[in-house]
């Protein structure tokens, strides 16, 4: 996602793609530490759900996904549904927190493995899913 006026086109194209029945994968991590599994999420990607609701009248689900390359697995967790009646700032926080909590819980429940972090850091600094030290 671009951080200038192109973001509007990105959101519009995303909504069009969703309306066409496509699934969208969003990787919302930023370079701010959160825990040993994830970096914090940028929140504004949730605005796609608001725009989608305005266009379709349907609430969008965000499906938490955890990639565990060392285990050769992709895990999908319980969907988190956008609430169009809630203030958007509140929904951004709620959805991001629910996604981060769900992904973290999924990762921690798995056998010990190396977590491939969002930031480009040396492999020697990679943590495991059972580490107590945050990524950043």
What is the predicted role of each segment?
Residues 8-136:
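Non-catalytic C-terminal accessory region of glycerolipid acyltransferases
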